[in-house]
């Protein structure tokens, strides 16, 4: 369970309003697939993932990144109940997709990297700390249904 102060919640939601979520999602998922190439096995049906350029320009990667980040954004509306917010996605990734839950942590790290780049000086150490708590909480919630 993630424990955010009211100030951290306000910081996260305030900064989130400044980002282009679709671009963050596409960049974060693309980076995950490039930096951790073994994660590509879940996306082999996306076509050409043969190079960093191919991954980052792949329309299916961008579309799925958008889908992922919109789920993440929905979770930001439920910071006090992330397990509930991500329950069905946890079940899907566990029972049907068989995704290693460690990958959720890796994707969270990619989200933080992209946010740091996009937000620049607004992504203060306090903001990084708050977002780190959030992505850790989301990763934990997504891993919740694993046996």
From Swiss-Prot:
Q: Which UniProt keywords apply?
A: Acetylation, Heme, Iron, Metal-binding, Oxygen transport, Phosphoprotein, S-nitrosylation, Transport
* A Pfam match: Globin
- Which residue positions does Phosphothreonine occur at? 13
What the entry lists under InterPro entries is as follows: Globin (IPR000971), Globin-like_sf (IPR009050), Globin/Proto (IPR012292), Hemoglobin_b (IPR002337), Hemoglobin_oxygen_transport (IPR050056)
Reply yes or no: does the keyword Secreted apply. no
What GO molecular functions are on record for this protein? haptoglobin binding; heme binding; hemoglobin alpha binding; metal ion binding; organic acid binding; oxygen binding; oxygen carrier activity; peroxidase activity
**What is the top-level taxon of the source organism?**
Eukaryota
Q: Which residues form the Globin domain?
A: 3-147
Tissue/organ expression? Red blood cells.
For the modification S-nitrosocysteine, the affected residues are 94
| Annotated CDD domains | Hb-beta-like
Q: What does this protein do?
A: Involved in oxygen transport from the lung to the various peripheral tissues.
Assembly and partners are described as: Heterotetramer of two alpha chains and two beta chains.
Family to which the UniProt record says this protein belongs: Belongs to the globin family.
Q: What is this protein called?
A: Hemoglobin subunit beta
What is the protein's species of origin?
A: Mesocricetus auratus (Golden hamster)
Q: Which gene encodes it?
A: HBB
